[in-house]
Amino acid sequence: MDMVENADSLQAQERKDILMKYDKGHRAGLPEDKGPEPVGINSSIDRFGILHETELPPVTAREAKKIRREMTRTSKWMEMLGEWETYKHSSKLIDRVYKGIPMNIRGPVWSVLLNIQEIKLKNPGRYQIMKERGKRSSEHIHHIDLDVRTTLRNHVFFRDRYGAKQRELFYILLAYSEYNPEVGYCRDLSHITALFLLYLPEEDAFWALVQLLASERHSLPGFHSPNGGTVQGLQDQQEHVVPKSQPKTMWHQDKEGLCGQCASLGCLLRNLIDGISLGLTLRLWDVYLVEGEQVLMPITSIALKVQQKRLMKTSRCGLWARLRNQFFDTWAMNDDTVLKHLRASTKKLTRKQGDLPPPAKREQGSLAPRPVPASRGGKTLCKGYRQAPPGPPAQFQRPICSASPPWASRFSTPCPGGAVREDTYPVGTQGVPSLALAQGGPQGSWRFLEWKSMPRLPTDLDIGGPWFPHYDFEWSCWVRAISQEDQLATCWQAEHCGEVHNKDMSWPEEMSFTANSSKIDRQKVPTEKGATGLSNLGNTCFMNSSIQCVSNTQPLTQYFISGRHLYELNRTNPIGMKGHMAKCYGDLVQELWSGTQKSVAPLKLRRTIAKYAPKFDGFQQQDSQELLAFLLDGLHEDLNRVHEKPYVELKDSDGRPDWEVAAEAWDNHLRRNRSIIVDLFHGQLRSQVKCKTCGHISVRFDPFNFLSLPLPMDSYMDLEITVIKLDGTTPVRYGLRLNMDEKYTGLKKQLRDLCGLNSEQILLAEVHDSNIKNFPQDNQKVQLSVSGFLCAFEIPVPSSPISASSPTQIDFSSSPSTNGMFTLTTNGDLPKPIFIPNGMPNTVVPCGTEKNFTNGMVNGHMPSLPDSPFTGYIIAVHRKMMRTELYFLSPQENRPSLFGMPLIVPCTVHTRKKDLYDAVWIQVSWLARPLPPQEASIHAQDRDNCMGYQYPFTLRVVQKDGNSCAWCPQYRFCRGCKIDCGEDRAFIGNAYIAVDWHPTALHLRYQTSQERVVDKHESVEQSRRAQAEPINLDSCLRAFTSEEELGESEMYYCSKCKTHCLATKKLDLWRLPPFLIIHLKRFQFVNDQWIKSQKIVRFLRESFDPSAFLVPRDPALCQHKPLTPQGDELSKPRILAREVKKVDAQSSAGKEDMLLSKSPSSLSANISSSPKGSPSSSRKSGTSCPSSKNSSPNSSPRTLGRSKGRLRLPQIGSKNKPSSSKKNLDASKENGAGQICELADALSRGHMRGGSQPELVTPQDHEVALANGFLYEHEACGNGCGDGYSNGQLGNHSEEDSTDDQREDTHIKPIYNLYAISCHSGILSGGHYITYAKNPNCKWYCYNDSSCEELHPDEIDTDSAYILFYEQQGIDYAQFLPKIDGKKMADTSSTDEDSESDYEKYSMLQ
């Protein structure tokens, strides 16, 4: 155990070190550098950026002509890009691609070919999210790092270890491994991505890789998928074409027993990039992007033609090495000749396309076995192909790899492509290659599963063993014998050797075994009842987890094991499943609890679910909660005892008491829904909507079978934002907690309270690549997935309160200014001066608008102009000039590069140029290292005299991207016109300037480390701590029952106002079921995308009490009736058909066990204020209503209500109907308060066990009871309708249908114990479900698909809990089981036939 922990810690430390080095950048690789670059190194770099060992010769006249021709083609390509929609499908595009794409526009061409910009717009910020997620959780970090260091290391871009391009390559591959976990990372991806990075920015290169791997035309997924359909299809084509064009080469390869086509195709892309010159690689890559996979086979054919003489002279081992690693070496033709032959070969292949076999489907790979060479006399002859061995049945046919047994001689090892030497292994009688082992090993074919390293034998491979370690060529793997009866085809694929998964990622023999499981007498393995796993049928862990949780609900399992469901199947329910769901689930439960099997395959149930819910078909991962809801609803409808559902009118509360509305709603629910699912899982919610206009309240009561609780902390977003002020002080980072639907206006308000700036002074901006990319609007919702990081800049406060994000006009009322110091007021504090020199205006005026106005204003106002979108400020970006080694024109020798944090510089129509320099210097001076003391006076004198070099930078007018001039036309290649440091006004007519740092000052004085220095406000730590702290289940329930305001998009239609109005909504728990299911909503839809919350929720395993969240009941209604587990007051005598109806419109705020209130609004008063004979009791004292002499003082009202006949209610009280008037209502309460207890006493006297027979109830009695807020009716209908259970009809049911009392010895408060948990680990796009459940033997088990292991309760992973299953304490399971005496079992023969027929079809399809 310690070794495993040490290994894990070492691996985590290694991941951390790798990420730290890439984050640190080039400095992390300095120790590995080989010293300074030698003089004249530029003469060793060719025009493609490849560094050669020797100095390159001068450019020849032919090469110069080629370069000039390429420059001439640039204008034609620019025209084509301008009219791309016209040319993108034309033959002219293909012709020009074969002629060559100019280097300077290869990036834009690739961008339009792969449609990069469109997918970027559809996925803003997605790359950054994937990159950060990859840093946290990617399992490919080590392998990516190993490949990055060897990718294009002879190129100047990738030469520096942890340099800029290596970092970009590493992050792209890391992000893609999370974006597409199915592919993850493969070695070839590093070479492909490196090519993209030569001409595309980092994010564009990422989306280029995404588009390429998703393109059906390029078929790259087939090279990396487990089934290898692309490679198989190309091989099928080559086996028809190449032998005709290169017969000698193919004969030589067959003679050596080597499948050369396979090896070459398996390594095609890597050889195509590494094996030839970069110039030719780029041109072939251009063609591949346009033509797609159809050029791959002609490229291989040309390579075979070039290599023919060398291949014919090479033996087997050398032949394999050359085909694998040196396939494209030493092309004997120049680039233009290769492209010319390629074009001709492609056209020829296109004409003969009809003679080729159809390509294999990508998802299935090749279904036909690969032909093997004929055998004669024990030696291999390559004169043709014999008939292929018989394959498996079509429904089970999957390719596998062939290999030699571990004890076979080294010479007899097959080639890595999978072709077996038949001189060592003769052909069996069935025509299937068998391995006649020299040392007496078992006969049969062999297959192996590849690992690059030798791992521990996984548990997935314990089926069909034995397995042996096997070492061959470049890989190590596990090998096992397979009998000839399997009749499975062989797979030739070399690069992905291994037993190929099915489409659902299961192993071939598992599906074959599972599909025939119903006909095979499997060996019975004794096990604990219920400790049986469920086989994963292809990403079905979500289904297995839900089934195991429901299966461990003991009353429901006993119901199915005893076969009671067969007596209650409802095959006529139009919204049911004709009994199929209940029948299949019952069969599965009986297998799970038989105690004879370690695992069961739920094929029939899965087929039934897929039939009625196609969304669960296929092999995609689904939500276990959605499956659970569908399963419970399906079981309920198939077992519903109501065969003809009556029409029920949905009524509004109309001010009626909650108790009355709740009883009516529950009664209506039971009239249509009565099953064991209702008895066990159904509760009732109270939903209240209050109109904010008139105060009208509408209340509804709805049933539920599980509670979906939001995670309160995840209803907030945690955001860290850096505030940069104008005074040049160190930036400060603040931590904010915002609502998920918060807008940027609310963000500014919170930030205002923390940083001391007014909202008008805060400018929010998204900073990316050292430039401002976007300004969020105030009315937009805050988004966490932005393209960069969010910053807040201080801007000069305008003279009138306007929105900085969308200014319309500015008031030019004067504002005081003293000595050129511009003052800012912040939250009522004293005016704070910012350091702007003399000459600044008294009012804030947009820069660049002076020419449009007279005296600077029009009627005291000045509108913003399009050329100056900012009010009173401009944006400055830091810039340095980088020398470019490859360029065509002299102005392109230096290219600008942005760095650091952009600045906000105050600027108006009155600002002088010198003021701009001073304002910039104030904000950047803290980044510059101070001058030595002896130079300080000289520097100050230079600044005073405004002489040439007084500032370490120069200001220039630039475009928004910071690369080109805003004044000069593009053909001048101007990088930005200089702004002189003078006294004249800075009329720049533009919103962006560049701060060009002088190279010497940048090197000697600029402190790069200071860029990342920020002061952290205490709110940052508070936000992080709140985000990481676990929450408890009570917090989730509190959030669920809290009041929320309905927004403008979901306005409520008020029946009183007769219009849609703003309203508030509140949910409350009214009735809790005996078995409570709690769903933690970890998956939430935020900012137009689904995300998973990893928040840890703490919950109780024992004695969980949710009664605090039940709607408080009026104590007068509870004094004689203990609370049921559903939170209702109920006298156990079976006299309630629709529950005791509450009289008061507003529930009392008191608890259930409090003394009677003295308030006149209560149903009954206490002893001191009650009418004569009116009883009063307190549960604390144990007193109750006086009973008759015949009643036992120790008898419980729960023992009542077992008579067959109907009950007669005694004549009590007035017959007046309840009034909504408070006066009438109170009078009704006083008149009937004492009579209610008399009613209970009379019932107690007549319905105790052994008591007298009851009398009948008259209609007038109903009226009397209703007048007092109650309705009692006979409930001897089985499982207690009045209790919320529904095992019988209302009224007219005999004692045969009744069951034992279900609520014996229940507590006043509902106390629950945990008995099952469904947990989800991983992320939204890829995760896994497991279940922890408590067995009747009081032991906990972990159900992980087919595995089931006992564990200690402390070992349960509660951090990943997703669905909780609680059981109320003190429940007798037998009370929920209906009596079946005298009932007829439903005929399930037709159901079985339908299920078996569909099951066979489903199995064949698998």
Swiss-Prot record:
GO annotation terms (biological process): protein deubiquitination; protein modification process; proteolysis; regulation of postsynaptic neurotransmitter receptor internalization; regulation of vesicle-mediated transport
Family membership noted in the UniProt record: Belongs to the peptidase C19 family.
Basic and acidic residues bias locations: 1129-1155
Expression by tissue: Testis specific. Expressed in various cancer cell lines.
Residue numbers annotated as active site: C541, H1328
Positions of the USP domain: 532-1369
Organism: Homo sapiens
Post-translational modification: Monubiquitinated; ubiquitination is calmodulin and calcium dependent.
Catalysed transformations (reactions): Thiol-dependent hydrolysis of ester, thioester, amide, peptide and isopeptide bonds formed by the C-terminal Gly of ubiquitin (a 76-residue protein attached to proteins as an intracellular targeting signal)
UniProt feature, compositional bias: Low complexity: 1156-1197
EC number: 3.4.19.12
Chief site of localization: membrane
GO cellular component terms, semicolon-separated: cytoplasm; glutamatergic synapse; Golgi apparatus; lysosome; plasma membrane; postsynaptic density, intracellular component; recycling endosome
Official protein name in the record: Ubiquitin carboxyl-terminal hydrolase 6
UniProt lineage: Eukaryota, Metazoa, Chordata, Craniata, Vertebrata
Cellular location(s): Cell membrane; Cytoplasm; Endosome
Family annotation (InterPro entries): Papain-like_cys_pep_sf, Peptidase_C19_UCH, Rab-GAP-TBC_dom, Rab-GAP_TBC_sf, Ub_carboxyl-term_hydrolase, USP_CS, USP_dom
Task of the protein: Deubiquitinase with an ATP-independent isopeptidase activity, cleaving at the C-terminus of the ubiquitin moiety. Catalyzes its own deubiquitination. In vitro, isoform 2, but not isoform 3, shows deubiquitinating activity. Promotes plasma membrane localization of ARF6 and selectively regulates ARF6-dependent endocytic protein trafficking. Is able to initiate tumorigenesis by inducing the production of matrix metalloproteinases following NF-kappa-B activation. May act as a GTPase-activating protein for RAB3A.
Linked pathology: A chromosomal aberration involving USP6 is a common genetic feature of aneurysmal bone cyst, a benign osseous neoplasm. Translocation t(16;17)(q22;p13) with CDH11. The translocation generates a fusion gene in which the strong CDH11 promoter is fused to the entire USP6 coding sequence, resulting in USP6 transcriptional up-regulation.
Domain notes: The Rab-GAP TBC domain lacks GTPase activator activity but is necessary for interaction with ARF6.
Residue intervals passing through the bilayer: none
